[in-house]
From Swiss-Prot:
This is Lissencephaly-1 homolog. InterPro entries: Dynein_regulator_LIS1 (IPR017252), G-protein_beta_WD-40_rep (IPR020472), LIS1_N (IPR037190), LisH (IPR006594), WD40/YVTN_repeat-like_dom_sf (IPR015943), WD40_repeat_CS (IPR019775), WD40_repeat_dom_sf (IPR036322), WD40_rpt (IPR001680). Belongs to the WD repeat LIS1/nudF family. SUPFAM superfamilies: Lissencephaly-1 protein (Lis-1, PAF-AH alpha) N-terminal domain, WD40 repeat-like. Positively regulates the activity of the minus-end directed microtubule motor protein dynein. May enhance dynein-mediated microtubule sliding by targeting dynein to the microtubule plus end. Required for several dynein- and microtubule-dependent processes. GO terms for molecular function: dynein complex binding; microtubule plus-end binding. Its main location: cytoplasm. Keywords: Cell cycle, Cell division, Coiled coil, Cytoplasm, Cytoskeleton, Microtubule, Mitosis, Repeat, Transport, WD repeat. Dimerization mediated by the LisH domain may be required to activate dynein. WD repeats lie at residues 104-143, 146-185, 188-227, 230-269, 294-333, 336-375, 378-410. Disulfide bonds: none annotated. GO terms for biological process: cell division; establishment of mitotic spindle orientation; microtubule organizing center organization; microtubule sliding; nuclear migration; vesicle transport along microtubule. It comes from Monosiga brevicollis (Choanoflagellate).
Length: 410
């Protein structure tokens, strides 16, 4: 891999800082002269940078070895005969206590996101910052600063190369995860921007706002391609289907809507909640089997089974609703929380739906039976957000208690 000119300069400055710190002043001076480092040599921000990069490489090498071992284990499992006693992935649920608990934000946590490949998590807060953490050790990595008011939502693209954020400052920012710089700021909403997502290609960003609209942005140009209107109040949450064809939205107008990305038309409006709808998300394909078991009571034939997509919504009416986009049906209402339900996330195996609420708990719902299978006292205050790692066994929650917690599933 060839370093860019800027990367070469940063490496030279980091080596220079290391030599100075190690007491090799003559070698440092000779290097500064040879490399023509100029006034940047001696800048305090480069002190310790070489050691940090070295430990990061070591950690990534270790993680790479672990992933290779996991792949080999999965291959061996695939070749081995199935056993009745083998714990299947669809049965994995979070187990207390949390394996990691970090704090560093000065105000409540509003959103969490997990890197799709690495053991890195991001947290957003009302303190206007985004922080990156090592999920396994809990070590703080860095802060992303640029917003001037509360950061309300964050999301990685599919590869984890970029992070998108939105804020009460009415802007959306796109961050490069290689150098942790803001590469694009999108402006156009007239009020708080409450939710953001990349599309499946990473070429577009979708945003929802208190100005009652949803916007579709082209990242290459920064232009707003389309504005979707229909909600009569604050649009609090959006999600994009896996194929990029649909958007679902949740609003303070008590409705959940599904929109066609191609046409911008609203396909369904569900008014089944009795209070503000805080969150809406699409079920992954792996959850369709459990959802069809719930619909039919037993496994349906391939022809009869609903192909979805399916939507889950969380509301201040203390309930979670499930919807079928293909039929427009309201499938079920899940009740059990004792306070506002803030967010949901699907288990990797698809059998369970996880939810967090102002009753300070995380609950695990068996979708096929529509019952709570586990209640976990998660935080000491309202639990505001949840995310599930796409490739390993971690669940992350964030809270008004200023803590981000990592939970192991088994």
């Amino acid at each position: 891999m060839v370093l860019t000119a800027r990367q070469q300069e940063e490496l030279q400055l980091a080596v220079h800082a290391y030599l100075v710190e190690a007491g090799h002043a003559e070698a440092a001076a000779a290097m500064a002269k040879s490399a023509n480092l100029g006034d940047d040599a001696g800048d305090a921000k480069y002190t310790g940078l070489l050691e940090k990069k070295w430990t990061t490489i070591t950690r990534l090498q270790k993680r790479n070895m672990e992933l290779q071992a996991e792949v080999e284990e999965l291959r061996s499992s695939a070749r081995a005969p199935r056993s009745r006693t083998t714990t299947k992935m669809e049965e994995w649920v979070p187990r207390p206590p949390a394996t990691v608990a970090v704090d560093g934000h000065r105000l409540p946590i509003t959103a969490v996101a997990i890197h799709p490949s690495f053991a890195v998590m991001a947290s957003a807060s009302e303190d206007a910052s985004i922080k990156l953490w090592d999920m396994e050790s809990g070590n703080f990595e860095r802060s992303l600063k640029g917003h001037t008011n509360a950061v309300n939502d964050i999301a990685y693209d599919r590869e984890g190369n970029r992070l998108v954020s939105c804020s009460t400052d009415m802007t959306i920012k796109v961050w490069n995860m290689d150098n942790f710089t803001c590469t694009k700021t999108l402006s156009g909403h007239d009020h708080t921007v409450s939710s953001v997502r990349f599309d499946h290609t990473g070429d577009r960003v979708f945003s929802a706002s208190r100005d009652k609209t949803i916007k579709i942005w082209e990242l290459a140009t920064g232009y707003c391609l389309q504005t979707l209107q229909g909600h009569s109040d604050w649009v609090r949450s959006i999600d994009v289907s896996a194929d990029g064809a649909w958007i679902c939205s949740a609003s303070s107008d008590h409705t959940v809507r599904v929109w066609s990305v191609a046409s911008g038309e609203c396909k369904h409006v569900w008014s089944d909640h009795e209070h503000v709808v805080e969150h809406a998300s699409f079920a992954p394909l792996v959850a369709h089997e459990a959802l069809n078991l719930m619909i039919f009571g037993s496994k349906p034939s391939a022809e009869a089974a609903s192909k979805g997509p399916f939507v889950a919504s969380a509301s201040r009416d203390k309930s979670i609703c499930l919807f079928d986009v293909s039929t427009g049906q309201h499938l079920a209402r899940l009740t059990g929380h004792d306070n506002w339900v803030r967010a949901t996330a699907w288990s990797r195996g698809g059998r369970y739906l996880f939810s967090v609420a102002d009753d300070k708990t995380m609950r695990v719902w068996d979708i096929a039976t529509k019952r709570v299978s586990k209640t976990i006292p998660a935080h000491n205050h309202f639990v505001s957000c949840i995310a599930v790692h796409a490739k390993n066994t971690h669940v992350v929650t964030g809270s008004v208690d200023l803590k981000v917690k990592v939970w192991e599933c088994n």
